[in-house]
Design a protein with these regions (language model features):
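Extracytoplasmic/secretory-pathway proteins
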Residues: 1-109, 113-167
């Protein structure tokens, strides 16, 4: 509601962000029909930057879920508009100030899935640490960085991050 309007019921936002599948969201993205949902109405008519972000985020989650399946193999067709590499590239290239922290989270999630741990760490060092400590996106990114540090064999730094996270 802080990014859109207090007139939008939280339930409408919840339905789109947490419940709607990628396929359902793609239909809305393509048709711009709100189906009575005030959040969809807002992002399709008043702030399409949020619409574009939501498509990228839902695509990222869909691909990551497929890649994490025990039945996944690299040559498998996933059925998404873009690859995980393209998701990472797009997330890094968008310079929308009000959504930058959200795009950073998506970039780091995609890069982590690709095993590009040093790039995750570089993003943390160059941008994420500049976000306020109470920023939710920074808090969601932090565990990925702890894991990335561990995977690039910087155990001391990883342990420090894991300790900060209470893990």
């Amino acid at each position: 509601q802080l990014m859109t309007s207090t007139d939008i019921p939280l339930e409408d936002i919840y339905q789109v962000v947490y419940k709607m599948t990628l396929e359902e969201f793609e239909r809305i993205y393509d048709s711009k029909e709100s189906n009575g949902n005030k959040f969809i109405q807002w992002i399709t008519q008043k702030d399409t930057s949020i619409l574009d972000f939501m498509l990228l985020a839902k695509t990222n989650e869909y691909i990551r879920l497929k890649r994490n399946s025990r039945w996944y193999y690299p040559s498998m067709k996933i059925g998404a508009r873009m690859t995980i590499e393209e998701v990472a590239e797009k997330a890094l290239s968008v310079n929308e100030p009000k959504l930058r922290d959200r795009y950073l989270l998506q970039a780091i999630r995609a890069l982590f899935s690709l095993g590009r741990y040093q790039e995750c760490i570089n993003l943390w060092d160059s941008e994420v640490v500049q976000l306020p400590k109470d920023n939710l996106m920074r808090q969601l990114i932090h565990p990925y960085i702890a894991g990335a540090e561990f995977r690039v064999k910087r155990s001391e730094k990883a342990i420090t991050y894991f300790a900060e996270l209470g893990d």
